[in-house]
């Protein structure tokens, strides 16, 4: 019996094939220098290679002893990456799905919603789970909480209306059913009208304002100086000046007494379409009649009206 077991173990421990009988295909390593000509220089890690080879040998031996025996599972060769983000600022993160933007936490997200007291005999209502906004687009007004100010207000208004309805129904418990329903309908119509009046001015008032450049005329009464400027930053679509200009002598801030769109005098276009264009002037000292749009594409151009920046 001993000789039979020794022969069997010899066949298990010494495989019939030679492990170095075939040729190894050496893959090309991109980061390897042409001067490195060692035998095992092409492999990324020789320890991993020999570990895999020994594991294959063990698997072959165990399959001969018992097909059900398999080597223990080992930890996968993966790497975990953690990202720490300031909750008060937006941060762009590269993940497996592509570039994503982690939005800052809204100030009203941590406030507890108004909960009505539980009724008698009913179990305690579970707490609401916190819902985080989805990442829709980087430049979408729905993506950030500060660009969508109406969502929180709508949720607060709906919670207030529900609380008022529950309190009104409990306070009017002794009334008849018909009168109680009429009172609820009247209160509901009043609350809906009040909510519409509160939300309407907020919706008309934008949270961010785009700026555009216009041409303005200034006049300082103290110094009796008049000057022009083609770089008056106004709110888009209006003549409201966002940044004031200072007088060159007394350094007082003044608003222009007249603001116009930057356009050519002859063709009345922001980009001149005249066959014979006027000469290009210095953008630092422009003149009204010489703004022709020939400096398009430059950092300081006469006909650039829109800005990619917005003021919150």
From Swiss-Prot:
Keyword hit for Metal-binding: yes
Source lineage: Eukaryota, Metazoa, Chordata, Craniata, Vertebrata
Similarity comment: Belongs to the ZAR1 family.
Alphabetical UniProt keywords: Cytoplasm, Developmental protein, Differentiation, Metal-binding, Oogenesis, RNA-binding, Zinc, Zinc-finger
Ranges of biased composition (kind: Polar residues): 86-95, 113-128
GO MF entry, a single one: mRNA binding
This protein's name: Zygote arrest protein 1.L
Region (Disordered): 79-133, 150-205
Biased composition annotated in UniProt, kind: Basic and acidic residues: 152-196
Functional description taken from the UniProt entry: mRNA-binding protein required for maternal mRNA storage, translation and degradation during oocyte maturation. Probably promotes formation of some phase-separated membraneless compartment that stores maternal mRNAs in oocytes: acts by undergoing liquid-liquid phase separation upon binding to maternal mRNAs. Binds to the 3'-UTR of maternal mRNAs in immature oocytes, inhibiting their translation.
Domain comment as written in the entry: Disordered regions undergo liquid-liquid phase separation (LLPS) for the formation of membraneless compartments that store maternal mRNAs in oocytes. The 3CxxC-type mediates binding to the 3'-UTR of mRNAs.
Entry's localization field: Cytoplasm, Cytoplasmic ribonucleoprotein granule
GO cellular component terms listed in the entry, alphabetical order: cytoplasm; cytoplasmic ribonucleoprotein granule
């Amino acid at each position: 019996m001993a000789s039979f077991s020794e022969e069997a173990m010899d066949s298990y421990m010494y495989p019939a094939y030679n492990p170095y009988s075939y040729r190894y295909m050496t893959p090309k390593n991109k980061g390897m220098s042409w001067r490195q000509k060692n035998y095992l220089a092409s492999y990324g890690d020789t320890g991993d290679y020999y570990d895999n080879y020994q594991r294959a040998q063990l698997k072959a031996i165990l399959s001969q002893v018992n097909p059900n025996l398999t080597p223990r599972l080992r930890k996968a060769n993966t790497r975990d990456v953690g990202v720490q983000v300031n909750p008060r600022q937006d941060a762009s993160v590269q993940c497996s799905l592509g570039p994503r933007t982690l939005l800052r936490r809204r100030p009203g997200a941590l406030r507890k919603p108004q909960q009505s007291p539980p009724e008698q005999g009913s179990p305690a209502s579970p707490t609401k789970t916190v819902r985080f906004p989805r990442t829709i687009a980087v430049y979408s007004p729905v993506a950030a909480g500060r660009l969508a100010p109406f969502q929180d207000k709508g949720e607060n208004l709906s919670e207030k209306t529900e609380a008022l309805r529950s309190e009104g129904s409990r306070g009017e418990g002794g009334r008849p059913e018909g009168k109680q329903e009429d009172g609820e309908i009247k209160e509901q119509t009043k609350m809906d009208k009040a909510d519409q009046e509160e939300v309407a001015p907020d919706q008309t008032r934008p949270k961010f304002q785009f700026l555009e450049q216009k041409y303005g005329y200034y006049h300082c009464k103290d110094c009796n100086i008049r000057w022009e400027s083609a770089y008056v930053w106004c709110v888009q679509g209006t003549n409201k000046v966002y940044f004031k200009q200072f007088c060159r002598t007394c350094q007082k801030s003044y608003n222009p007494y007249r603001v116009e769109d930057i356009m050519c005098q002859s063709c009345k276009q922001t980009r001149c379409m005249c066959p014979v264009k006027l000469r290009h002037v210095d953008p630092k000292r422009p003149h009204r009649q010489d703004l022709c749009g020939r400096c398009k594409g430059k950092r300081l151009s006469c006909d650039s009206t829109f800005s990619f920046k917005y003021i919150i």
